[in-house]
UniProtKB/Swiss-Prot annotation:
Family per record: To E.coli RlpA.
Protein name: Uncharacterized protein ssl3177
Species assigned in the record: Synechocystis sp. (strain ATCC 27184 / PCC 6803 / Kazusa)
Taxonomic superkingdom: Bacteria
Length: 90
């Protein structure tokens, strides 16, 4: 388990190809991570609320983890922008 913080994809990424070759949209349950292998499924848990979501690592980022907007909404209000999370590889 890794303790980090989560952000979410901005609108400018909709329609762009992710590192796995698929096209990003806000409705997919995907995430970008700097080092976990593409295709890895992880549980991302908001450390403040205990809410969690399972996503597939489909892209790369320079941050801890960047969630799709739909995935982020499962664990926090997007107005928060960044939340402390724990990441568990499944």
């Amino acid at each position: 388990m890794m303790a980090q913080s989560a952000t979410f994809y901005g609108n400018q990424f909709v329609g762009r190809k992710m590192a796995n070759g698929q096209v990003y949209n806000h409705g997919r349950m995907v995430a970008a991570h700097p080092s976990l292998p593409l295709g890895t499924r992880v549980r991302v848990t908001n450390r403040r609320t205990g809410k969690s979501v399972v996503v597939t690592v489909s892209d790369r980022c320079n941050c801890s983890i960047d969630l799709s907007r739909s995935a982020f909404q499962q664990i926090a209000n997007p107005r928060k922008g960044r939340v402390p999370v724990s990441i568990t590889r499944l």
